[in-house]
Amino acid sequence: MTQSTTEDTLLRLAAVIDSRKGGDPEQSYVSRLFHKGDDAILKKIGEEATEVVLAAKDVRQGGAPSALVGEVADLWFHCLVALSHFDLSPADVIAELERREGMSGIEEKALRKRREREENGG
């Protein structure tokens, strides 16, 4: 799968998720999540993140890698719901990843801390 195809897939899925805002919670799982509010969405992300960890541990012990892929897909999906809820999109995340590209994690973390200090007047 190419990068543009991956980005296109995320943007298409995000558009479908956005279209569920204000929808009938009896007809759509995503509409139901939006209707319940951000606490329900965030709780679901926490649950899915835990399932990713457990699936990864299973793979480490010889479990099916496809289970891990499925759990990561669930996590990404619910993260897309959260982004939509807060009027953000995958493009915002992609832009941030592109900004970090080529920068070591240590360097990126130091830069982030420096920015936080500057923003807080320190």
Curated annotation (Swiss-Prot):
Domain of life per record: Bacteria
TM ranges: none
Cellular component GO terms held in the UniProt record: cytoplasm
Cell compartment(s), UniProt: Cytoplasm
Gene Ontology molecular functions: ATP binding; phosphoribosyl-ATP diphosphatase activity
GO biological process: L-histidine biosynthetic process
Primary residence: cytoplasm
Reactions catalysed: 1-(5-phospho-beta-D-ribosyl)-ATP + H2O = 1-(5-phospho-beta-D-ribosyl)-5'-AMP + diphosphate + H(+)
Alphabetical UniProt keywords: Amino-acid biosynthesis, ATP-binding, Cytoplasm, Histidine biosynthesis, Hydrolase, Nucleotide-binding
A UniProt-annotated Pfam family: PRA-PH
UniProt pathway: Amino-acid biosynthesis; L-histidine biosynthesis; L-histidine from 5-phospho-alpha-D-ribose 1-diphosphate: step 2/9
InterPro entries (alphabetical): HisE, PRib-ATP_PPHydrolase-like
Entry EC number(s): 3.6.1.31
Gene3D superfamilies xref list: MazG-like
Family: Belongs to the PRA-PH family.
Protein name, UniProt field: Phosphoribosyl-ATP pyrophosphatase
Organism: Burkholderia mallei (strain ATCC 23344)
Lineage: Bacteria, Pseudomonadati, Pseudomonadota, Betaproteobacteria, Burkholderiales
Gene from which the chain derives: hisE
